[in-house]
Every structure is written in C-alpha cells, then in structure tokens.
Amino acid sequence: MFTESDYEKLHQIMAESPEKEELLTRLLHSHHMDISTISHEIRNPLTLIYSTLQMIEASNPEVLNIRHWSDLHSDIEYMKQLLEELSAYNNGQRLSPSSTDFDIFLKKISLSFASSIIETDIEFISRIEPELPVMPADSIKLREVLLNLLGNARDAVLIQQSSCSNHLDSACNCESNRFLNPGKALTYSPQIHFHAWKEHSNLIISVSDNGCGIAPEHLSSIFEPFVTYKSSGTGLGLPLSRRIIEAHGGTLTVHSEPNLPDCQLKTTFTLTIPIP
C-alpha cells in the first residue's frame, strides 16, 4: 500500500510530463481497484464464516463454553473492521462536497461527542468561534475525522486516568512512568478541548487533551498505514484522517509533549482547511 510520502513522490513525477501523468494516473486507478477487489473477495467468505458460527451456536449451545470460542467472534469483528477501514482509506481522497455551514456542523459534532462521554469524568470544553465559513466540504468524511480525533483523545485521558488510579498515593505522568509529589493526594482531572476558529483565509480546528501523550519516537510514524501503538485498532484511523483533510486541500498536524504535568494539555491535533 502506498504511504502519503509515496503519493507525494508520484505527484512530483506526474508534474514532469503529460505522458508520466497519464501513466501514473492509470497505475493509481489500478491500485485503488485492486484494493477494492481484494476487500470484496475477503468480505464475502468472512460473512459466510460468521453465519456458520451462528448456526453452530444455535444448534449446539454448549460450544459457547469452549475455551477461546469467543475469540473467534472477536477476530472476525476485527477483520470486518479492518476491511471497512481499508476500503475507507482507499477511497479517502474521493470527496462528495456540498455546502456546509461549519458553525452548525461543528456544534452538532460537539454535542454528539459530549453525549457519548456523559457517564465519564471527562471535562469536555468546546469553543466554536463566531463567523465560521459556509463552504463546500464532504461533511460526512469530515465528521469521521473529527470523531476519530475526539475518540483518540477520550482513549488517551482514560488511559491516563486508569494509570493514576493505580497509584492512589501519588500524582502520575503515564508516558515517562515517573511519579511526582510522593504522598500528595491524586487530583488528575481528564480534559478534552475542542476549538474552531477562522484565521486569515483558513478554518482551524484543534482537538487537545491532557492524556498520556505520544512518545517522541512515535510522532513521525502515527500517520503511516497500519502503524498503531494501541492494544486494539487497525492503524488506519489517523492515515485516513490525514488523507481526507489533504483531499480538502488542508493539513493535519500533531504536537505532543507527554512529560508535561497532568494539569496541562499534552497533545493537540490541528486541522487547517483553506477557505475558498
């Protein structure tokens, strides 16, 4: 699978001559078709396997007590998720833009995410500045990007909260695994900030959190396909997010300082989308 740097090099070569552009355009189209075909061919037998498992369970309920039987379901669900995300990544640059009022659009996303964490201790701070643009955008794909970033922030603060709860006699910093102020009562308060504003001719959207942060050695690779440092996940969420933002002519960047105190925001993802 091509990485983002591969695509950049291909586009540089395509700019050299019309002949190279035509040849590489056909190559990229064939590459997209191959991935779509492979995903389709795998998905069909996978669906059949899942149906067979359900039939076995219905006629032989005792199999539910077999060790690792439930792992079969988990593995199948993971493969289905992988195929769905692979297909989404393959089509990440294909947009269906429509007129989007970003004030309304972002407030809906903010409310949707806030309702999903209502039973947690997470403090969610949303700041949507006035005079955001109304402009063409693929709102469905942008929604996926923003909810993915917010979901990652939620995971990061919950990991940090869990790490701190395991050390009730000290305040902690999970990335460095160092513990500060021994003997002091733990006061970790998980926070996620969602901020959108207009700056010159750009729409800027940021998602920040005071979770466990991202190790410096991982920052350069988190946007590469299939790279993940989570116990679960396919490693396609961030690459797909960047691909969608770049298809809008924008950028998606990250800044993280995992060794900051827990009261400070450690990781920020920033989307910059040009306003036509």
Residue ranges, per PLM feature:
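Conserved signal-transmission helix
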Residues: 1-30
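Conserved DHp (HisKA) dimerization/phosphotransfer helix of two-component histidine kinases, i.e.
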Residues: 2, 66-116
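Conserved catalytic submotifs in the C-terminal HATPase_c
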Residues: 118, 123-133
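Short conserved segment of the HATPase_c
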Residues: 214-225
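Detector for a conserved hydrophobic position within an alpha-helical segment of the HATPase_c
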Residues: 245-246
